[in-house]
C-alpha cells in the first residue's frame, strides 16, 4: 500500500511540474517584479495542486468596476501581482467565479492558493488565503520550486476578448459571495498579518 501511495505522489508531482502551462504567459525575466517596495505590496497567486492541470484559472483584481487582469495561473505556477497597500478584492474565473478579499500592507508579500474543485462540466477554482502559520509547513517549501509567470500581450488580449463573459460571471457570483455568512467571508479574507 505504501508503494502504491508513493507512486501516486510521484505521478502527481510530475504532472504538477509538467502540467499544461498557458501559452499566454511567460516566465518572469526580472525577479525585481516580485519584490514588494516601501509603497507597494505583492500578492502571489500559486496553484500547486495537479488536480485540473489541463484547465486554466484566470485571476483578476475587482476592487473597482474594472476587471484588472492579474494573470492566468496554471497548475504548478506562481503569478505575482504588485498593488497598493489597503483593501482589495480578487476574483478567479473558470466555469464559475470565486472571490477573496485582501487587506495588505506595504513592503510585504502575501500568498493566495488557487484551489481546484470539481465543477458541473469542468474544474472550478477557489481563492484561499495562505495564513502566516502555513509558511512553516513543508508544502510551502515545495512552492519555492514553482516557476514565476507574468502577463504578455496574448494574456491581455484573452482578457479583452473574454471581457463580457468575465463581467457576467463577476455579477452573478459576487451576489452569491455577498450573501455568505460573516464566518465564511472571514475564511476567504487575507489579513494584514498573513504576510511572509
Q: At which residue positions do the language-model features occur?
A:
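Short loop/turn and low-complexity linker motifs enriched in small/turn-promoting residues
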Residues: 20-196
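C-terminal motif of bacterial Sec signal peptides marking the signal peptidase cleavage site
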Residues: 15-19
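Bacterial N-terminal signal peptides that target proteins for export
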Residues: 1-8
Amino acid at each position: 500500500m505504501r508503494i502504491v501511495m508513493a507512486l501516486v505522489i510521484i505521478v502527481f508531482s510530475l504532472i504538477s511540474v509538467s502540467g499544461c502551462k498557458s501559452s499566454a504567459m511567460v516566465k518572469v525575466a526580472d525577479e525585481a517584479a516580485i519584490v514588494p517596495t516601501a509603497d507597494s505590496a505583492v500578492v502571489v497567486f500559486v496553484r500547486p495542486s495537479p488536480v485540473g492541470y489541463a484547465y486554466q484559472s484566470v485571476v483578476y483584481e475587482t476592487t473597482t468596476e474594472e476587471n484588472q487582469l492579474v494573470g492566468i495561473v496554471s497548475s504548478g505556477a506562481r503569478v505575482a501581482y504588485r498593488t497598493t497597500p489597503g483593501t482589495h478584492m480578487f476574483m478567479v474565473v473558470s466555469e464559475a467565479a470565486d472571490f477573496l478579499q485582501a487587506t495588505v500592507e506595504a513592503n510585504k508579500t502575501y500568498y493566495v492558493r488557487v484551489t481546484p474543485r470539481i465543477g458541473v462540466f469542468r474544474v472550478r477554482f477557489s481563492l484561499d488565503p495562505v495564513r502566516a502559520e502555513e509558511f512553516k509547513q513543508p508544502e510551502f517549501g515545495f512552492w519555492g520550486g514553482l516557476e514565476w509567470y507574468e502577463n504578455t500581450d496574448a494574456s491581455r488580449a484573452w482578457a479583452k476578448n473574454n471581457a463580457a463573459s468575465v463581467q457576467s460571471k463577476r455579477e452573478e457570483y459576487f451576489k452569491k459571495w455577498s450573501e455568505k455568512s460573516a464566518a465564511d467571508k472571514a475564511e476567504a479574507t487575507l489579513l494584514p498579518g498573513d504576510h511572509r
